[in-house]
């Protein structure tokens, strides 16, 4: 059977998608600078990158950066609801194979990911760009014959990074990987500032609820949880936080939030947001005591944080509109579930703004370049990008914000034992 060149919702959406991509490019100065810097040398020539990452307008700019640098690229989304169909169409129309549409079934999702492994000429992938680990796991488990030819994996998100470390610890990881998530210009920007804007956008588009005056509980106080708590608080909600880690819990307390258990929060809260990357955070016993029309949503990568199966088994489901379901419990109370417990900011909104994603995707691009061109520096294991590149990503975004850096004098440089051009911090500095 001949391989499809692409599969998207509607290729006629390409013109709309192209207009949005052009606007996004102006908001993604880092990626556009990397095109100018590395494009002429075609630094990724020969790379066959299989990508599994939310097929959004911002990702379209990333894809076109990779191809501008000489790579061949095939793409699927890493979530069944996160594709922006106009973005998928616009990229497919350029000849890049895209297999993604909003509202895939689980079976369709798996099919889409699998389409990215072998290219149109019959050659397999030799690089992986992943978000969450589904593509990495698929290749390791189902296509081990291709592993020897893969130079590297770059992983976008916390959940996928956990997967890489677990695989490496168990001896199952067969390809060198770069942990993009823990680059400072990713985790401290995308995870925090991105979620701070996109969480509210998703909730508002889905429900139009007034957040001011409500009680909201945020499960988890990592970078994602911090951003979510800030946004809810700034909208006027009283924010509760649940945590397992005493350090994060103390941070939340010092930021003015009350640390409670989910058992305490469940009957008090109007809005529930899970951010943990763990399973079984909101369970049946919590649903049973919730307020009328409590809004429950997740902004962690996978859909295991909220026990949706319990709701489906114990409550009557009524779909209000796509990605908004209102459940009726046996006690007559209604619960509103967003995006079927998957990423609310992408399922009900359009995800993070372009500017902050330029930070993340610069890290992805630099990781792909590093793994492709400096293979000998990345033995089997999970690595980080060097600090000097992290600083460079930040530097690429300052002009657009009108920021002017101070330059160290030679005496200051000598006094601090810090190079004038950086890096300015030791690797373990926490920011």
Swiss-Prot record:
Positions with a binding annotation for substrate? 56, 131, 156, 186, 190
Q: Which interval of the chain is the signal sequence? A: none
This protein's GO cellular component annotations are: actin rod; cell cortex; cytoplasm; cytosol; extracellular matrix; nucleus; phagocytic vesicle
Recorded catalytic activity of this chain's protein: S-adenosyl-L-homocysteine + H2O = L-homocysteine + adenosine
GO MF: adenosylhomocysteinase activity; cAMP binding
Among Pfam families, the record links this protein to: AdoHcyase, AdoHcyase_NAD
Report the top EC class in one word. Answer: hydrolase
Keywords of this entry: Hydrolase, NAD, One-carbon metabolism
What family does the entry list? Belongs to the adenosylhomocysteinase family.
Assembly and interactions? Homotetramer.
Q: What is this protein called?
A: Adenosylhomocysteinase
Q: Identify the taxonomic lineage of the organism of origin.
A: Eukaryota, Amoebozoa, Evosea, Eumycetozoa, Dictyostelia
């Amino acid at each position: 059977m001949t391989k499809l060149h692409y599969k998207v919702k509607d290729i006629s959406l390409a013109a709309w998608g192209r207009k949005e991509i052009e606007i996004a490019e102006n908001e993604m100065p880092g990626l556009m600078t990397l095109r100018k810097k590395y494009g002429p040398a075609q630094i990724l020539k020969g790379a066959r990158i299989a990508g599994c990452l939310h097929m959004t307008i911002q990702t379209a700019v990333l894809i076109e950066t990779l191809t501008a640098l000489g790579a061949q690229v095939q793409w699927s989304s890493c979530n069944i609801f996160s594709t922006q169909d106009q973005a998928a169409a616009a990229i497919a129309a350029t000849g890049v194979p895209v297999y993604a549409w909003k509202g895939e079934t689980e079976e369709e999702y798996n099919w889409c990911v699998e389409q990215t492994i072998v290219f149109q000429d019959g050659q397999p992938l030799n690089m992986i760009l992943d978000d969450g680990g589904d593509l990495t796991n698929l290749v390791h488990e189902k296509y081990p014959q291709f592993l020897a030819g893969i130079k590297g994996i770059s992983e976008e998100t916390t959940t996928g990074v956990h997967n890489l470390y677990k695989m490496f610890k168990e001896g199952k990881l067969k390809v060198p990987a770069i942990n993009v998530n823990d680059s400072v210009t990713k985790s401290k920007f995308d995870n925090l500032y991105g979620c701070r804007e996109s969480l509210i956008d998703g909730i508002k588009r889905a429900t139009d609820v007034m957040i001011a005056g409500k009680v909201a509980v945020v499960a988890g106080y990592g970078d994602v949880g911090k951003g979510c708590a800030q946004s809810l608080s700034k909208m006027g909600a009283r924010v509760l936080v649940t945590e397992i880690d005493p350090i994060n819990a103390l941070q939340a307390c010092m930021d003015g939030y009350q640390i409670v258990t989910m058992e305490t929060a469940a009957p008090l809260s109007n809005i529930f947001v899970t951010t943990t990357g763990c399973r079984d955070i909101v369970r049946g016993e919590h649903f049973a005591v919730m307020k009328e029309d409590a809004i429950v949503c997740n902004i962690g990568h996978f859909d295991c944080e909220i026990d949706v199966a319990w709701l489906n088994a114990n409550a009557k489901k009524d779909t209000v509109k796509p990605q908004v379901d209102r459940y009726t419990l046996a006690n007559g109370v209604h619960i509103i579930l967003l995006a079927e417990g998957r990423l609310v900011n992408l399922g009900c909104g359009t995800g993070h703004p372009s500017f902050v994603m330029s930070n993340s995707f610069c890290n992805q691009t630099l990781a792909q370049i590093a793994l492709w061109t400096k293979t000998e520096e990345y033995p089997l294991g999970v690595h980080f990008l060097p600090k000097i590149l992290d600083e460079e990503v930040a530097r690429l975004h300052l002009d657009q914000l009108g920021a002017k850096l101070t330059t160290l004098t030679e005496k200051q440089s000598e006094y601090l034992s810090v190079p004038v051009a950086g890096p300015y911090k030791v690797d373990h500095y926490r920011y």
